[in-house]
Amino acid sequence: MGLPWYRVHTVVLNDPGRLISVHIMHTGLVSGWAGSMAFYELAVFDPSDPVLNPMWRQGMFVLPFMTRLGISKSWGGWDINGDSITDPGLWSYEGVAATHIILAGLMFLASMWHWVYWDLELFRDPRTGKPALDLPKIFGIHLFLSGLLCFGFGAFHVTGLFGPGIWVSDPYGITGRVQPIEPSWGADGFDPFNPGGIASHHIAAGILGILAGLFHLSVRPSFRLYKALRMGNVETVLSSSIAAVFWAAFVVSGTMWYGSAATPIELFGPTRYQWDLGYFNKEINKRVQASIASGSTASEAWSRIPEKLAFYDYIGNNPAKGGLFRAGAMNNGDGIAAGWLGHAVFKDKEGRELFVRRMPTFFETFPVVLLDKDGIVRADIPFRRAESKYSIEQVGVSVAFYGGELDGVTFKDPTTVKKYARRAQLGEIFEFDRARLKSDGVFRSSPRGWFTFGHLCFALLFFFGHIWHGARTIFRDVFAGIDPDLDEQVEFGAFQKLGDASTRKQAV
């Protein structure tokens, strides 16, 4: 059969046995990819510095998803928090990757078996003897089984009743770890940042799926509904399945990009809105002010700020700063973070504290402007020095560092002050190693950005796929040009006059 590449699935349209075979093979390919990709990422992942070189800076894609489900240990003797371990067991990165590859092999064998033994009695309608699938019953079976899985995940895995729990963190991504979750059954369960909602919603959705599955197994659709929704056509199944997938892809694109309890910043990196809103900057300043109010010096207050929190407050970790066509991990852009230099405080010669205006997300270059506490421009780095009135040299700006590696150091040299003013545009100032990976200095996106972009593209593609296959199954008679109820009347040679049932030819 000379089919074009986009029509090859036609061969399994009316062949239930081989339809199952290709689906098993597809599941095996997905499972094999997941296991293989996990092993690849483990081979290139550096677990030595979970604070300044976390998985999302290294461009890991599979590892964050494994970690959020409760996997945190490796056969390499490390865990995700940088500690040494002795007995990781099967529930480890390598253990789960290996089980996926083994599953892929079993799926491959099962697919081969179903391809060879395609003509099973199970797939034949006992009334007609022709290949047929009881699609409403199959729908009920799948709904029941997926409901069981959903309920089991929420009731056992997430709650820790039989499982590790999931990754839970504080709002600022400092204290994250794997722990059991208590289901939230109140209105707070609908808060997208409340992990308790993950448990309760899986339990509730699982129960609903089980009940709906039992309903569809025990109640047959009316003939009118069966005909109206084309329940006898396997392309109806394809169309509605694609609808479920594209809807899920749109939803997870949103929860990833805007952030949620299921997409913690310790595993996927911060969101762009946390930079836009000064989320970490406000928290850092709040902690510093509280420390100073309790009697600490500025140096002591800034030294208490966790390096992890300071690193989040850096524009290079904003997923919207990396272009969609800049391939590679964040570390391939600005380099591997080596250390926090400390918080830079600028002052003019009159003693006023100045604040560098931070670069907005969608700027590649931005003027260096220093403002006082009232928002008045006091200094800048001018484009045309001949007309400048607020240059660093004219205003006499100095910079002092609190906390970090340069704690207590002050610079008054205009060249050095300008260097740190430019870097302060990008948030907290860090030192980067650009030599090790030959980093090019151009920002990259995090797995959060890549996941969102990929799933939005696939969701759009699958949306059109749903429309296409839905239209094909609903309007099949229109596209064929023949009413399915008139097939005998228009059969060539059945009647003396085409379409006239009163002129049927007599068999000789």
Swiss-Prot record:
Location relative to the cell: Plastid, Chloroplast thylakoid membrane
Listed GO CC annotations: chloroplast thylakoid membrane; photosystem II
Cofactor detail note: Binds multiple chlorophylls. PSII binds additional chlorophylls, carotenoids and specific lipids.
Disulfide bonds: none
Protein's GO biological process: photosynthetic electron transport in photosystem II
Protein role: One of the components of the core complex of photosystem II (PSII). It binds chlorophyll and helps catalyze the primary light-induced photochemical processes of PSII. PSII is a light-driven water:plastoquinone oxidoreductase, using light energy to abstract electrons from H(2)O, generating O(2) and a proton gradient subsequently used for ATP formation.
Chain ranges passing through the membrane: 21-36, 101-115, 140-156, 203-218, 237-252, 457-472
Gene: psbB
Primary localization: plastid
Record keywords, A-Z: Chlorophyll, Chloroplast, Chromophore, Membrane, Photosynthesis, Photosystem II, Plastid, Thylakoid, Transmembrane, Transmembrane helix
Assembly, per entry: PSII is composed of 1 copy each of membrane proteins PsbA, PsbB, PsbC, PsbD, PsbE, PsbF, PsbH, PsbI, PsbJ, PsbK, PsbL, PsbM, PsbT, PsbX, PsbY, PsbZ, Psb30/Ycf12, at least 3 peripheral proteins of the oxygen-evolving complex and a large number of cofactors. It forms dimeric complexes.
Superkingdom, natural source: Eukaryota
Family the UniProt entry places it in: Belongs to the PsbB/PsbC family. PsbB subfamily.
GO molecular function: chlorophyll binding; electron transporter, transferring electrons within the cyclic electron transport pathway of photosynthesis activity
Protein's membrane topology: Multi-pass membrane protein
Keyword Membrane part of the UniProt annotation: yes
Pfam families noted in UniProt: PSII (PF00421)
Keyword Transmembrane: yes
Name the record gives this protein: Photosystem II CP47 reaction center protein
